[in-house]
Structure formats: C-alpha cells, structure tokens
C-alpha cells in the first residue's frame, strides 16, 4: 500500500495547473466539469492552446504568462482515473507534487463559493482520490469550486453529472472569473495571500463582480518534446 504524504509543504512555485472533469460534449456544462471550465478559461486568457497528448492521457498546453512558464492539463481519462494523467506529466517533467494545483468541484460548498487549500484529503471526490493515490501525497494545493448539494430526492451522481440550471449560470460565470483570478493570485503573490483574499468571498449575490485584472497577450512557447 502506497504511503500518502499528508504534511502541508513549504510553499513551492506552481508548475502545473490541472482541471478535473470528464471528456466529451455531453459532460461539458456539468457540475463535475468545473475544473475543465477553469483550465479552458486560463488557456484562452493566457493564449495557450490545449491539444490531446497521448503520453499524458489528456489535453495539455504550455506557454509563458504572468512572467513564467505555465503548464495546463485536462485529463481525458474520465474522472475516476484522473491521477494517471497527472502522474504522467509529473514523471515526464520531473515535477514535485507540491508544484501542482488541482481545480475541481465540491458538493460541500454552495454554488458561489470557492476554497483554496495547501493540502488535504479527497473529501469523497473520486477524481481527487485518484490524484492522491497516483501522487502518493495529499500535500499539494487545490482549488475547490462549490456546486452545492442535490435537491430533493436527486442522488449525488445525478447531481454532479447534471448540467447547471439557467438560473445558476450568472453565479457560475462569476465564480469562474474569480477562480481564474485566484489562480493568478497564487502564481503572482503566493497561495497564502490568495487564500486570505478569495476564501472569504461569496459570489452568489448580484453585487459580486470580481474578475481577473486585464492581462497583456501571453507569449506562447513551442511544445517541449
């Protein structure tokens, strides 16, 4: 049995941002795909194209933004095997698990809230269980986006694999903008600053207009072989 490291690391420069989700258009707007949504917005904002990389079992891109090299990954393994793709990138580039930021949905938070942490358990999220198992560590930062609990008699699986309702879209848009800003804050000012700034905020109300600051067009580097 793999021993899992649980001690929060000293803050390490982020090298890879991973969004968890399921591939395919049928899952594109589901609650379980919040991580994919954030990585897609980062890729567009930074000018980093994503393309399927078989060696990584995922959609991957790299380039320069915010003064440094940035790597983005969306595992194409389906949620429960996400860790295979993350491990493949870490092994290829010889990255420390503590340099990975994983973005994913969380039913324990209501829609409109997000939560940054430097380490922690999977909290019942199967994608994170896979990442922790393959990295052999819980000691890596993560950004959780709230999707709330099922309503009425709906089960958990049906809830996370269900699409956001039209009435939820405005809140989701604000949360995604805030998540992009939180990732950029992590990169520029560090995880602790980002936690203090974003964890207390509630984006469920109409007065929340937080969004990332304007960014100069990113310079994209050619892919490494």
From Swiss-Prot:
Catalysed conversion reaction: an N-acyl-L-alpha-aminoacyl-tRNA + H2O = an N-acyl-L-amino acid + a tRNA + H(+)
Record keyword RNA-binding present: yes
Subcellular location field: Cytoplasm
One GO CC term on file: cytoplasm
InterPro entries: Pept_tRNA_hydro (IPR001328), Pept_tRNA_hydro_CS (IPR018171), Pept_tRNA_hydro_sf (IPR036416)
SUPFAM superfamilies noted in UniProt: Peptidyl-tRNA hydrolase-like
Record keywords, A-Z: Cytoplasm, Hydrolase, RNA-binding, tRNA-binding
CDD domains, per the entry: PTH
Region annotation Disordered: where it falls in the sequence: 198-225
Entry annotated with the keyword Chloroplast: no
EC number(s) from the headed UniProt entry: 3.1.1.29
Broadest EC class assigned to this enzyme: hydrolase
Residues the record marks as active site: 32 (proton acceptor)
Molecular-function GO terms, alphabetical: peptidyl-tRNA hydrolase activity; tRNA binding
PROSITE patterns reported for this sequence: PEPT_TRNA_HYDROL_1 (PS01195), PEPT_TRNA_HYDROL_2 (PS01196)
Site (Stabilizes the basic form of H active site to accept a proton): 105
Residues that, per the record, bind tRNA: 27, 78, 80, 126
Similarity field: Belongs to the PTH family.
Subunit structure: Monomer.
Task of the protein: Hydrolyzes ribosome-free peptidyl-tRNAs (with 1 or more amino acids incorporated), which drop off the ribosome during protein synthesis, or as a result of ribosome stalling. Catalyzes the release of premature peptidyl moieties from peptidyl-tRNA molecules trapped in stalled 50S ribosomal subunits, and thus maintains levels of free tRNAs and 50S ribosomes.
Name of this chain's protein: Peptidyl-tRNA hydrolase
Species of origin: Synechococcus sp. (strain JA-3-3Ab) (Cyanobacteria bacterium Yellowstone A-Prime)
Source taxonomy: Bacteria, Bacillati, Cyanobacteriota, Cyanophyceae, Synechococcales
């Amino acid at each position: 049995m793999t021993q899992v490291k649980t001690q929060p690391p000293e803050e390490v420069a982020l090298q890879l941002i991973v969004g968890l989700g399921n591939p395919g258009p049928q899952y594109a707007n589901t609650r379980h795909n919040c991580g994919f949504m954030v990585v897609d917005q980062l890729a567009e904002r930074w000018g980093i194209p994503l393309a399927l990389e078989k060696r990584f079992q995922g959609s991957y891109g790299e380039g320069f933004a915010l003064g440094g090299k940035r790597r983005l990954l969306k595992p194409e393994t389906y949620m429960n095997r996400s860790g295979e793709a993350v491990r493949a990138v870490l092994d290829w580039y010889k990255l420390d698990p503590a340099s990975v930021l994983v973005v994913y949905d969380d039913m324990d938070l209501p829609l409109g809230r997000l939560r940054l942490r430097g380490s922690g358990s999977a909290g019942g999220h199967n994608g994170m269980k896979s990442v922790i198992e393959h990295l052999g560590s819980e000691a890596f930062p993560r950004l959780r986006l709230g999707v709330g609990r099922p309503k009425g008699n709906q089960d958990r699986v049906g809830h996370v694999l269900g699409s956001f309702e039209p009435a939820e879209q405005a809140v989701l848009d604000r949360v995604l903008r805030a998540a992009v800003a939180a990732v950029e804050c992590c990169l520029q000012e560090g995880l602790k600053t980002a936690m203090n700034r974003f964890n207390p905020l509630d984006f469920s109300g109409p007065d929340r207009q937080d969004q990332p600051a304007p960014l100069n067009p990113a310079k994209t580097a050619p892919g490494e072989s």
